[in-house]
Amino acid sequence: MPGWQAIYQRLKDKNFEIVSVAQDTNGVKDAGPWITAAHPTYTALIDEKHLVSKLYNMVNVPTGVWIDEQGRIVRPNEVAFVDDRFKDFSGLDSAPYLNALADWVEKGDKSIYVMSEERLRERLTVNNSDIALAAAEFGLGEYLYKSGHLTEAVPHFKSAQRLNPKSWNYKRQAYALSDAKSDYGTTFIDEVEKAGGSKAYYPPPDLMPSVNPQDKRP
């Protein structure tokens, strides 16, 4: 959050807003202290039902979506590091993403980092029956967990992970709610390593310019 606060301070006077949404089943209890400690001056919300992840097909954090003043997505879900605290693990330098973000804020739809509709369609993940069923299974697991039935919740969390194996959010949240080794026979780090390490866990954002700068309309 400190990284986002620094970005907000730098860009807030240029018609730029940040809405951060913590995806946390335990809500204020777990996410609240982090927000309080960060003292953000941008909008910080907590999503106990993981609705944002469901609606935007987000599978990991930190994930950013760029939305313009007309409510149109101009860049879809992608890894969004705004500082280098986790660079040793992720292997990602935050500078290219930050430069692209600043370029968009400055130039709007003329920014070379705004995606064309064709490219957006290629990048957007379309819901299929497995993804939809995974969300339903995860929601049922959350309901059972909050009702005090963790043992009954675990099979539904497992089903969500099986149906949507790309969702690290499902793994991260489920493992945090119980003893992962005991209930799932694995740990989060084990799963990252099994998938191929940090490069698979954090695929770099596609910051290739959409068009040549001179091709943008004046």
Identify the function of each model-found stretch:
Residues M1-A37, E48:
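Structural microenvironment flanking redox-active thiols in thiol-disulfide oxidoreductases
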Residues I131, L163-P165:
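Short coil turns that delineate tetratricopeptide repeat
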Residues G32-V61, V65-I67:
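Short, internal strand/loop/helix patches
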Residues D68-H149, S178:
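Thiol-/selenol-based redox modules, centered on thioredoxin-like
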Residues L177-P205, P218:
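Alpha-helical linker/edge segments of TPR/alpha-solenoid repeat scaffolds
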